[in-house]
């Protein structure tokens, strides 16, 4: 029991639940205050990103008087807001994309195998829980964790797999991939 905590904690590492396939990461904890007649009532707000490392990811926000309860609420909110993101070869993005939320902008670039996750702060948590292994990301503008996570999700929402592009254009995936200039022609459509 000495090395294992039963509740909460601020270790910022991945906490895997016993009976779940999801991995969750605590992105940010903020102490908030509500001003009442008798003074200030303090609480905590938590931002959590959750994913199955196979292409599903979500984020949630929770507020409570205690940190573990705020994290639990944020995790439940993230589980309700899961989205599926198509990955190329199960390790990177299909194409370069940009996203924005408020004053925060993010640019995400697909990367060759072995590059790793080159991203800062909240974006790294999203990519690790999503299952992306190779990506280069840059954030410009707001460094607020909430805006960065929402901008990253906005970018991921605009990503298209070759299969969906081919279906939209009413052509075959092989025809679409043969048109690619340079790069690898044997891209696996997911």
From Swiss-Prot:
Extract the coiled-coil ranges from the record. Answer: none
Q: Does the keyword Phosphoprotein apply?
A: no
Q: Which domain of life is it from?
A: Bacteria
Q: Which Gene3D superfamilies match?
A: 3.30.160.20, 3.30.230.10
In alphabetical order, the GO MF annotations are: rRNA binding; structural constituent of ribosome
A Pfam short name: Ribosomal_S5_C
InterPro entries hit by this protein: Ribosomal_Su5_D2-typ_SF, Ribosomal_uS5, Ribosomal_uS5_bac-type, Ribosomal_uS5_C, Ribosomal_uS5_N, Ribosomal_uS5_N_CS, Ribsml_uS5_D2-typ_fold_subgr
**What family does the database annotate?**
Belongs to the universal ribosomal protein uS5 family.
Please give the PANTHER family that the UniProt record associates with this protein: MITOCHONDRIAL RIBOSOMAL PROTEIN S5
* Name this polypeptide is given: Small ribosomal subunit protein uS5
Which organism's genome codes for this protein? Rhodopseudomonas palustris (strain BisA53)
Lineage of the organism: Bacteria, Pseudomonadati, Pseudomonadota, Alphaproteobacteria, Hyphomicrobiales
Tell me what gene encodes this: rpsE
